[in-house]
């Protein structure tokens, strides 16, 4: 799980202004960090099917946020996927 320090640094790197914690960019970055953590978790705990369902929910939520951002502002979308190293 992400510590509050890790969450703070992710928010700081992706926020649009000083008090921004809920923009799509920040939400996508936080979801990506949780997805990455769970992916590493499953390399060790292959039979943890309960958490795998949670991972699939997180991936779907990130996909919806990316689609929203793509429809609203294509430049910000491209910037986020490039910074996070995601596929289109």
UniProtKB/Swiss-Prot annotation:
- Where does this protein come from, organism-wise? Syntrophus aciditrophicus (strain SB)
MF terms from GO for this chain are:
rRNA binding; structural constituent of ribosome
Family matches, as NCBIfam families = S15_bact
What is the protein name for this chain? Small ribosomal subunit protein uS15
Source taxon at top rank: Bacteria
Q: Does the keyword Membrane apply?
A: no
Q: Is Disulfide bond there in the keyword field?
A: no
Alphabetical GO CC annotations of the entry are:
cytosolic small ribosomal subunit
Description of how the protein assembles with itself and partners? Part of the 30S ribosomal subunit. Forms a bridge to the 50S subunit in the 70S ribosome, contacting the 23S rRNA.
| Family under the similarity heading | Belongs to the universal ribosomal protein uS15 family.
């Amino acid at each position: 799980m992400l510590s509050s320090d890790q969450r703070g640094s992710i928010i700081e790197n992706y926020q649009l202004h000083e008090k921004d914690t809920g923009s799509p960019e920040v939400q996508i970055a936080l979801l990506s960090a949780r997805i990455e953590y769970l992916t590493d978790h499953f390399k060790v705990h292959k039979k943890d099917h309960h958490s795998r369902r949670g991972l699939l929910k997180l991936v779907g939520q990130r996909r919806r946020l990316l689609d929203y951002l793509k429809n609203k502002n294509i430049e910000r979308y491209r910037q986020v996927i490039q910074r996070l190293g995601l596929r289109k």
